[in-house]
Amino acid sequence: MDAVSDGRGAIAAAAMDQRGSLKKALAKAKGGDVSDAMMEEFKGAVTEVLTSHASAILLDPQWGLPASKKRAKDAGLLLAYEESGYDNNKPGRLPGLLPGWSVQRLKAEGANCIKILLYYTPFETREVNEQKHAFIERIGDECQANDIPFFLEPVGYDPTGGDEKGAEYAKIKPEVVKQSMAEFTQDRYGVDVMKVEVPINMKCVEGAKAFGGVRVYSRDEALDHFRAAAAVATKPFIYLSAGVSNAEFTESLELANESGVKFSGVLCGRATWKEGIPVYATQGIEAFRNWL
């Protein structure tokens, strides 16, 4: 854990393990196909520039291993173990592992920690969630057998197919985050650190800078949701940026601080670099480095 923390013991990590979503975004901005070399180059530039300001970088073994060699000497390495995305043809957003990889192999590539993203909601069917519970138990056992910390990233969703960025989902998001934290901080899962979403949608907080016009929570209610989710956790947790803008993520962290919750840091990805995608796609690597 020391390898991915700063001198205060806090985790201030950058995330660059996006795969399918990054490739689509680059292809859209470029107006054409994206090669493996471009994926590696983009990840390498982000790693090289941002790790001088971060305690660690989260990468994937598909396109991120060359980038891992470019990180700052004091920056730790987390490697993703899950397959990107999920199978739309099956219900429940069931998880899968990267073929050809194991915790032992990721550790041999220099990983200080293992990360798993899991789509999870307590409002899913019991049958689906039991499969997910067993899946995480197996990963926890594998990490413990290899003596490496396990970071779990539960990402909530609407099992009825609703928009997770909309106001209706914002009403249930606090409960999704809270129950996910209560479930997976149980010892049987072997999770060392939870990488969690903030338990609210900042665009729905009345009076917030990010407020989008539809009120779901007052400021005091939002603060209470932070406290309620943190209260059920029995393991350390950090907040993820979940693709929102840097300004919105910063405002959510200010709210977390105001609430008094004891979070252990952040893992910030797209909020930091996503606006540079068109720069890289249209102007090339040097322009992107300068933008970063």
Residue ranges and their predicted role:
Residues M1-R126, G190, V214-S218, K235-P236, ...:
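Alpha/beta catalytic barrel-like cores
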Residues M1-G9, V128-I148, D158-L292:
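Expand to "…catalyze enediolate/carbanion chemistry for C-C bond making/breaking, isomerization
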